[in-house]
Amino acid sequence: MFEDSMIIQNDLDDLIEITSKIGNVLDSPGYGGNVSVKTLDGLYIKASGTALREPFQIIHENDSRKASLEIGMHKNSKFKYVLHYHPIYIIPIISGALLDRFSKYNPKIVEYRTPGADLSDCTVGDNKLIFLRNHGVIVQSDSASECSEIIDDLAEYKPKIKYFYCPDDFVMQDNPEQILANAYISLFIKSSNLELDTLGTEQCNKLLTPDEVYRQNLKRTK
């Protein structure tokens, strides 16, 4: 019995450690995202209404407290660990090109469905990486280390969201909230069938010249 409880606790600790990678504004804005692990005594899943970037509750599937609305996708998965989150740097670029880039994880793309029960069967199968169009991603594996590896591979796309609309965007290009705001603006512009009008290389370079000392200092000290 003691050994079983230790195994269960280790599984939960592994889940918490993996989740720490995606508990940030770029991966899980707001209260979005949910994670789970299947252990010796059943399924443990993030409680509804808790944020991944804060200390969150992991509850047993039979707990009286409300589990995530998307518990179906976790229960239907054949894998031990399931992590669903909403990386703002991946959602805008979901396409067939990502299937080639992440082919070793047997990825697939699922067309948009309403979050919740409509997505309950999307985790069925051998796909360790699932792209949910206009929604997010699902990472699943029997190995905690492989889940961590997939998350790290996806995170390589974080630096690619660098749309410079105005001088302060360029200066604060590594600020998470600025990146989030720019991604939102970009999606809004594209959804309106408008063209992005960004700062060019010459304009960006000029921001670091003496007549932009204020921003040059910000750039140097941030």
Which residues does each PLM region occupy?
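Glycine-rich flexible loops
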Residues: 1-222
